[in-house]
Amino acid sequence: MFGGGGMNPRKMQQMMEQMGIDVDELDATEVVISLDDGTEVVFSDPDVTKMDARGQETYQVLGDPVERDAADAIEAAPADDSDDTDDDDAIPQGDVDIVVQRASVPEDEAREALEAADGDLAAAIDHVDE
């Protein structure tokens, strides 16, 4: 039935096109899945496939996952922020990017929230979500 065991890849591609399914390989260097319990599942150098079936996008991630605590990942970030900041007192650009991504806000709003929270990522995200 399914699985395409022994099926010609070209024939499989034609069938998928007829059904309105578009498949693309993505060049991902890392995939991070954040779980509700505060852990992250991290895939380094994964094979990522994006399938678009009539507007419904599905991503398939293949690789060797590693679980880590999200708080540990933030602390383990590289200490060399020389390119990320304008001066010693500025908020690192990486922190701003995290708030922008997690809270879906503009960069200037994320930076203001981080400054108001004295650089605390969680507090800044909570602040912009209010």
Swiss-Prot record:
Pfam families, per the entry = NAC
Tagged with keyword Cytoplasm:
no
Q: Which GO molecular function annotation, any one, does this entry have?
A: RNA binding
Which superkingdom does the taxonomy of this entry point to?
A: Archaea
**GO annotation terms (biological process):** protein transport
Q: Where is the composition biased (Acidic residues)?
A: 78-90
Q: Where is this region: Disordered?
A: 65-91
Keywords (A to Z) from UniProt: Protein transport, RNA-binding, Transport
What sequence ranges are listed for the domain NAC-A/B?
6-74
Could you tell me what this protein does? Contacts the emerging nascent chain on the ribosome.
What family classification does the UniProt entry report for this protein? Belongs to the NAC-alpha family.
Q: What quaternary arrangement does the UniProt entry report?
A: Homodimer. Interacts with the ribosome. Binds ribosomal RNA.
The name under which this protein is listed is Nascent polypeptide-associated complex protein
What is the name of the gene encoding this protein?
nac
